[in-house]
Structure formats: structure tokens, C-alpha cells
């Protein structure tokens, strides 16, 4: 999908929430969506990073985004319900949701997985994603044509040694997406996954410290697929898992 050329007004008048919007793919997605007409809601745990993305968007002349400082690790379903009501009160609807926030944890043998780290990865990569989506469904249903995009990984389709915790969280992500896609297939909201592939991010450097980052795609390079799934040109795509860098 990276040969997709999005019209500049692809996301005009759309309200899109991006999690993990402070850096990496999330920050680039927010800036790209804003450049294509969206009003972005920037969610992340580090206010200074969100403010930097906010400044980039405003200085580029795009719609002023909203900032939601939230640490998914400590958030409860009640936090998400309150956020959802605020979005409805302020914007009336939610047209798009990009679940980008996730953590890797440490790669280790399955027998050595730390129980607390397992809980932390599942809280951020799975539980927070599930409860946030659950809370936001009423706002999504108020949109004319809403899109929810989950972030997956190749290890969420085929398990790999030493990737146990992260892989299980991404297998679960695929399952959540498929379940929701089937439940809402007759409604005005669609659910899909996106696999960014090897990309020049901090998480990639953590997983592959010896890898040359200059050999990898940048977050900007993979944005066409992110635009495609969020825009109305993918309105008939539901329950799919797309690769930004197909082999």
C-alpha cells in the first residue's frame, strides 16, 4: 500500500485519536493525518512530547489538535469512559482511532518471563486497547464512516522464540480486531490491523540494537498505508491485516 497516493483532503473534517502520539510512528501519523485535513486528538503519557507534535501541526497551518495526557499503564475503564464523553461533548463524534501505543518488554525465554513485565505489556498492548475501544464505540458510531486501526506485528501472526510476551499481545490484537470486524460488519465502523514492519523507531532499536537504522524505512515512508486505512477510500475494507512493507 505504500504506492497509495492520498488526496490532500482525504481526512477533511474528520476527528481522529492517535495513541502513542508523542514520538515515532504515532507522532508521524498525527502530523500526516493533520496535513490531510484531520483534527487530531493526541494521546500519550509525556506531555512535552505531545506538545512538540502539537506545535509542529499548528506551525504547519493545520487544524489545532487536542492533547490527552494519559498513561495507559495506569488507566482504568473509567478513565476511558470519561475521555469518550469528553470527545462526544467537544466534537460530537469520533471518525478514526489509531491504536499505536505499545511496549516491547524484554525478549527472553518463555520460562524466564517476568510476571510483572507480562502484566505491564498486556495492560498497555491489550487491556488498555480493549477498554479504550469499548468506551469509544458510541462516539465512533456517531460518525458517518469510522475507522479503527490496530497495530500488529509479524510475531502476532506467527510466534517466534523469545518474543513470547509481545507476540502473545499481538496475537490477541489480531483476535480483537477480527471479533469487532465481524460484530460491526453491518454498521458504519470498520476494524483493521496494520503491520508497520521494520521501521526506524526506538522500539525497533530496542529489539535489534545491532541493526543499522539507516537500512530501515522511516515512519514517514510507511504513512501511505496509514492514510489508506483511515480514509474513506478503504470504506469496504473490514477485518483485514495489512502490511506496510509486504515481502
Predicted regions and their residues:
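Conserved glycine-rich cofactor-binding loop
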Residues: 15, 20-24
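C-terminal helical subdomain
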Residues: 186, 193, 201, 210-247
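Active-site helix of classical SDR
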Residues: 133, 169
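Conserved glycine-rich Rossmann-like NAD(P)H-binding loop of the short-chain dehydrogenase/reductase
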Residues: 38-53
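Residue(s) in the substrate-gating loop at a strand-loop-helix junction
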Residues: 153
